[in-house]
Amino acid sequence: MQTPPMIQSGAIAYGLATLAKDGTVLDTWYPSPQLAEGVKESGSQVLSETDARTHLGEAFVKTMGPCELRGVNVVAVKTSIATLAEPAKDTHDVFLRLHLLSHRLVKPHQANLAGIFGMLANVAWTSMGPCPLDQLQDARLRARAARVVFDVKAVDKFPYMTDYVVPSGVRIANVDRVRLGAHLASGTTVMHEGFCNFNAGTLGASMVEGRISAGVLVDDQSDVGGGASIMGTLSGGGKEVISVGKRCLLGANSGIGISLGDDCVVEAGCYITGGTRVKMPDGSVVKARELSGRNGILFRRDSQSGAVQVIPRTESWGSLNADLHKN
């Protein structure tokens, strides 16, 4: 599978940003982001109440202003991106790029996300919205005094996707395992132990019961089995983008650090890294990275010798259960 090329077009969106008392941007929610051509300059600006009413609507204006309980202020913003091929300019810009991914307006790797970790604050994501960590204890006490539920769901730089975007045709059994910036194609089902990071996801109907790490692409009609792991690009200095082709099956508790072409199977419990020594049908032994991206192969471990073998495949492993993907 070819990694989607970075796109040159830009984007424009209006949204609501949550600011800490010191002005730190905790999040920005863009309900209707759009790709745009001819944007002259990248940047973000705070909107007046009148402009917010024009571009967002009265219901959004009513949410603006200070929230004393969390110690934050909610403002309306307009964010413009001249080209998604250039790095993000500010935190609003980062959130817009993550929204574009989860709205399926761009595919993973089509927007430049270099350096975004340094632009995102570590935030307490609560049932009442984002909260600065230095306000968390006071916010909890104020919530108790007001007799309202205040549940801390996560402490992280990335929020849950479904707090901002719920793509059509998708089922997610455990929403805290899908980060904003995940790209889930229509027909995707993410089961309870499935996980999808930002700038990663599915390009067609898929079953996700394992982990799709950052940067990973899974193509149509593929199944990431329970507990299966696909190595990403965030840790360990990895640069290679791992992809899974069409109609592939990763067995339960298997894993890959190489790309799979179409119609491939990795046996349950078998973990294939780039350096794994693999026995070929002719008896020769090669490193698995030499087979990266090949179509129609089965990786399995010999139950007697323990050696990893690769076998050509001419038959389908089956297919996804269509009833599980009518979302």
Regions found by a protein language model. Name each.
Residues E240-G245, R289-G293:
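Glycine-rich, flexible loop segments associated with nucleotide phosphate handling
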Residues D163-Y164, D176, A252, S284-V286:
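A generic local structural motif
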Residues V170, D176-V178, A182-L184, T188-V190, ...:
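A structural motif detector for beta-strand N-caps
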Residues M1-P167, S292-N327:
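Terminal amphipathic alpha-helical/low-complexity segments used for targeting or macromolecular assembly
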Residues G261-D263, V278-K279, R313-T314:
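Composition- and surface-driven signal marking solvent-exposed, interaction-prone regions
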Residues G275-E290:
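A conserved acidic, glycine/proline-rich C-terminal tail/linker
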